[in-house]
């Protein structure tokens, strides 16, 4: 094989190795971003201002409101 052929094959091998390395880095970044999105997701509760004020006096959060009865807790689950 001529010297030019060996140089071309070497160049192709180097390009292939570099693009494979970049693809792996992009895949890791996408996985990391997906994990961060899952962690940021939260539940937004919609309750009346009266419920918020009532629970605020007890230094708690209004988690649920049903027919004027307020459920005030330190942490709202689910």
UniProtKB/Swiss-Prot annotation:
Signal peptide: 1-19
UniProt-annotated location(s): Secreted
Xref: Pfam families: Conotoxin
Record has Repeat as a keyword: no
Main location as per UniProt: secreted
Claim: Cell membrane is one of the keywords in the record: no
GO CC annotation terms, alphabetical: extracellular region
Family: Belongs to the conotoxin O3 superfamily.
Entry protein name: Conotoxin ArMSGL-011
Organism name: Conus arenatus
């Amino acid at each position: 094989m001529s010297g030019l052929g060996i140089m071309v094959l070497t160049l192709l091998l180097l390009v292939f190795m570099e693009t494979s390395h970049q693809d792996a880095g992009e895949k890791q970044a996408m996985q990391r971003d997906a994990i961060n999105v899952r962690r940021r997701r939260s539940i937004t509760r919609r309750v009346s201002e009266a419920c918020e004020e009532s629970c605020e006096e007890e230094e708690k959060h209004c988690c649920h409101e049903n027919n004027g009865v307020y459920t005030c807790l330190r942490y709202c689950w689910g």
